[in-house]
């Protein structure tokens, strides 16, 4: 069918959501707008679905949700998995609606849907999958994307985002269905009355927080003063529950960002990695003067932070810096209190800081590196569990502000990260040090490992083709020098024998020890460039990264 024919079909059939009809009527005759909504089906992969909320096959709406869920139901029934699925959502627009639509499809296919009655974090969904013995999980979230986005993450029975093989099998099942005529659907209220849709009770969340608290080294945090922002997302309830149980009583929540609001009015891009999202909280810090500011993204799986800079202001801690801070803290405290397991394992990703390597060596920890995406870190926990030794896992992190110190869930967990950050801050405060002092101490001990990230956005069908062309060009005409330094080695993770699954990632290793990696984002229309340098000073390493970034910008033109 042509895009115009698809438009006409959707205008005739997509009648259950008035917002979609209004949108379609508004673009009638606009070829570009119609093409953008219908030129493809919204891509499904290991991250599930993610896209702009709206009308069409390339948008997030009740029809794309139903079709994806029908494919998932077919997969579960064919694979003989437990016929139970846990479902959660965060504060994004239409999150509750999409969750209920997924539950309706599952119930119609003989699968019991366990539904959180209100918004909850992504890690609480990962927890619920294992806690309830489900065959899969669904989390309706677009993480830290702008407000116009929503998404549909799928989890396996292990509580980890589905593997490449499972994603391919689910996609094959999805592709057998159209959007309107082959979807099994039941009435929501009738399914609840029949026990086919079950509300998850509060005990599940309390037990999740208990599991996080069980990982505490136990340092006194009672003197810690904290500013916290959930960025209008799902973090407030579990994080406050955790802090109360820990004994952190001096907590100021950023009022403008306290209540759930899918419009994210104070930060159009609710990502705690960036200053814009943290700016409202940083202004409050000028008045409250906390020891630590913490922000969690809308689905509360990422955590950002800021600490006093010693000059009267506050300095953001990067994801890599927090990762090595927590890694070092966990190692030293577990060795100190005698709880370090035999043959401990930590896991990070290929784009995360190389400082993790000397820290692991110092403490006798095996460090494993995976492809980008916390699902691969969760997969490593599963491998250890299959060997009968999940206790060997002590920590995992990625540069994009994801952390996990236990096997209670199989995804990054900002509730866990808040606990660790508070403990680490209190540990150093007892020694008269701030977290910034601790970061600088690590730099002095291991070298000034500095990292940076450049993102380049390419919207729509034209942008998708341009991204593909850039990656193809870098493969056929690899640069010989970058920022004046010779390229010592090129690693193509799509073709070279790296020991990891094939991935669309290119890595350039320079003669000076610097590194540049290029990959298309799996969830956004972006190419991401990861920069890494180590030098004798922060300024020298940053200068190398800046020069490499300038080179990368030329590639993206």
Feature locations, PLM:
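Phosphate-binding and adjacent anionic-ligand microenvironments
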Residues: 286, 290-292, 313-315, 333-519, ...
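Glycine-rich phosphate-binding loop plus the immediately following alpha-helix
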Residues: 155-185, 320-344, 348-359, 414
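An N-terminal, well-structured beta->alpha segment
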Residues: 5-102, 109, 191-192, 197-224, ...
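Short acidic, glycine/serine/threonine-rich loops at helix termini
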Residues: 96-101, 126-130, 148-154, 175, ...
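Conserved phosphate/anionic-ligand binding catalytic regions in large, soluble enzymes, centered on
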Residues: 38-58, 142-143, 230-242, 298, ...
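Gly/Ser/Thr-enriched, mixed-charge loops and adjacent short helices
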Residues: 33-38, 42, 150-279, 284
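N-terminal small/polar loop signature for handling phosphorylated ligands or for N-terminal nucleophile
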Residues: 86-149, 245-305
